[in-house]
Regions:
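Glycine-anchored helix-breaking recognition loops at helix->coil/strand junctions
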Residues: 1-7, 11, 122, 139-170
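Sequence-level motif detector for i,i+2 pairs with an aromatic at +2
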Residues: 36, 65-68, 94, 121, ...
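Sterically constrained small-residue positions within well-ordered secondary structures
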Residues: 61-62, 89-90, 116-117, 154-156
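A generic structural motif
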Residues: 129-130, 167-173
Length: 193
């Protein structure tokens, strides 16, 4: 298994520095944690319709095709395990936070999915009108910092709704969604997201 350096060089030459040109090179935000508060997952995704389990209970049940991603219980590759066709009964709406609740080694991680997809039954999907690609990335980063609580065989399961995460807040009851969005936008390369 030798590394084909010529192929690596050929591929790297397909991209130029212009492909990654950004005006954002330094963060513009000062993180004042004194305004941050703890919020439970069920307060961020209120109502049973906003925290729902994935619909695919067997990978073999996926329809043939390549229009949609099948997301499984893994962090690598943003959870993508396969591509599949459309099935109205199995599709999950995108623009959500994906909580990995079961599986081998990735329990406790979170993902952000921007498009419709097929979700494993080992996942719980969180929906909130304030979620977008920026707030989604912010939340996933914070949620992944809480992962240590769910290692060594402990699963999200019944603990997920009551899990608390520290977020910027407008007041004790309201997360500061615009701060989260603007912070991600201000990060180096935030304009390329």
């Amino acid at each position: 298994n030798k590394i084909d350096w010529n192929e690596i060089i050929r591929i790297s030459n397909l991209f130029t520095a212009e492909d990654y040109h950004t005006s954002k090179t330094t963060p513009e935000f000062n993180l004042d944690l004194s305004t941050w508060r703890y919020f439970s997952i069920d307060s961020l995704f209120p109502g049973k319709e906003n925290l729902i389990r994935g619909k695919v209970h067997s990978k073999e049940a996926l329809p043939d095709g390549d229009e949609y991603y099948y997301i499984g219980a893994k962090k690598k590759n943003n959870g993508i395990e396969a591509r599949c066709g459309f099935d109205k009964e199995l599709i999950s709406e995108g623009n959500c936070i994906v909580f990995i609740c079961n599986g081998q080694g990735s329990v406790g991680y979170a993902l952000y999915m921007d498009r419709d997809f097929m979700a494993s039954g080992d996942l719980v999907l969180g929906y909130n009108e304030h979620i977008n690609k920026y707030t989604g990335l912010f939340l996933v980063t914070i949620l992944d910092k809480e992962r240590f609580k769910y290692s060594f065989g402990r699963k999200y399961g019944k603990y997920l709704p009551n899990t608390k995460i520290l977020l910027p807040a407008k007041d004790s009851m309201t997360p500061d969604w615009s701060f989260m969005e603007n912070m991600i936008k201000s990060m180096p390369y935030g304009d390329l997201i």
